């Protein structure tokens, strides 16, 4: 999967910000990878069905409808994690792992049952060759407004909205309170269970959309994988200290590493080194290990993250 930086960055931004909402509410969500797969599967299946039917929908409208479907399915899948974690007080890591294991198997099975194929094909007509006016801006035009997708800008929109919601709204204040001091939040009338469900639902919606955002620029079929971007988004979340502004920086760093790993052959200096292809593929994950080794000790995770809330305990 070859991605440019301006394609990889929105994926990591959207999914990491989704994880932020869940974990800020106090629920660990390592199911991001599985939710991405389910969101991508459902939305690509929708695109495949519409394109196969011959319906004359404008490409960008079709893509936006697919985004809504990916978000809806992401919410639906995340509710299974929310119920297990919040109501049943199950181990949140185990619950997330179960979804990660279930999603690719289900996607392959459903694709075979519904379309009689393992890989769901679609026609990629969504690329925007050039944004009028903006595409003519020197330097920035070719970088951001040529040969791009509408989903590229979605990542930055999600970043702006997330920052406002988290720090400038009553909802954001209550969400953060439930992740830090749920008993205190409950004592002033905040429904901790409801807020945690909301956090996980937002997380699921964004992760589902992130799955679609991954598939559209990389391929013309979906084969039940998102190349580990869900796990990489968790590293972005931790490195970004659960804060939108820092998550942007972390997403840029890891997106750059992922881009180098997938497009090194187009960089003359790296291509001439004679280093095996597999070594470059390791770069983003080795970088993840190194960064987390140096930053995890000082990470400021929400205090109640991963701790099931019991209304009767104080």
Where are these regions (language model features)?
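Alpha-helical transmembrane segments within multi-pass membrane transporters and channels
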Residues: 56-104, 160, 253, 258
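Transmembrane alpha-helical segments in multi-pass inner-membrane proteins
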Residues: 217, 221-285
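Cytosolic-side transmembrane-helix boundaries in multi-pass membrane proteins
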Residues: 180-194, 264-314
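Hydrophobic alpha-helical segments embedded in the membrane of multi-pass proteins
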Residues: 10-20, 34-38, 76-79, 179, ...
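Helix-loop-helix "hairpin" substructures at the membrane interface of multi-pass membrane proteins
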Residues: 144-222, 244-245, 249
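Short, small-residue-biased leader/transition segments that mark boundaries at the very start
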Residues: 2-9
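Transmembrane helix-bundle core of multi-pass membrane transporters
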Residues: 103-168, 269-279, 299, 304-314
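Short loop segments and helix-boundary regions at transmembrane helix junctions
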Residues: 24-28, 77-134, 168, 227-228, ...
């Amino acid at each position: 999967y070859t991605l440019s930086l301006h394609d990889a960055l929105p994926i990591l931004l959207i999914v990491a910000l989704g994880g932020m909402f869940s974990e800020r509410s106090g629920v660990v969500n390592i199911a991001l990878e599985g939710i991405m797969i389910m969101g991508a599967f459902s939305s690509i299946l929708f695109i495949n069905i519409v394109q196969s039917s011959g319906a004359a929908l404008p490409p960008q409208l079709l893509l936006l409808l697919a985004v809504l479907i990916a978000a809806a399915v992401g919410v639906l899948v995340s509710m299974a994690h929310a119920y297990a974690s919040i109501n049943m007080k199950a181990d949140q890591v185990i619950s997330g792992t179960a979804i990660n294991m279930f999603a690719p198997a289900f996607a392959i099975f459903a694709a075979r049952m519904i379309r009689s194929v393992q890989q769901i094909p679609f026609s990629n007509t969504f690329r925007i060759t050039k944004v009028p006016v903006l595409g003519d801006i020197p330097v920035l035009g070719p970088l951001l407004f040529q040969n791009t997708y509408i989903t590229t800008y979605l990542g930055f929109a999600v970043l702006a909205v997330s920052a406002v919601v988290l720090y400038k709204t009553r909802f954001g204040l209550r969400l953060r309170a439930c992740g830090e001091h749920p008993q205190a939040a409950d004592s002033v009338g905040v429904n901790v269970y409801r807020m945690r469900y909301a956090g996980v639902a937002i997380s699921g919606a964004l992760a589902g959309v992130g799955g679609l955002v991954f598939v559209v620029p990389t391929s013309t079929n979906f084969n039940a994988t998102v190349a580990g971007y869900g796990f990489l988004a968790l590293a972005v979340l931790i490195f970004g200290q659960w804060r939108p502004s820092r998550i942007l920086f972390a997403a840029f760093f890891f997106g750059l590493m992922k881009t180098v790993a997938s497009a090194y052959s187009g960089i003359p200096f790296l291509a001439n080194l004679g280093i095996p292809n597999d070594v470059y593929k390791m770069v983003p994950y080795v970088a993840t290990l190194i960064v987390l080794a140096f930053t995890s000790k000082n990470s400021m995770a929400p205090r109640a993250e991963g701790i099931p809330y019991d209304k009767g305990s104080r």
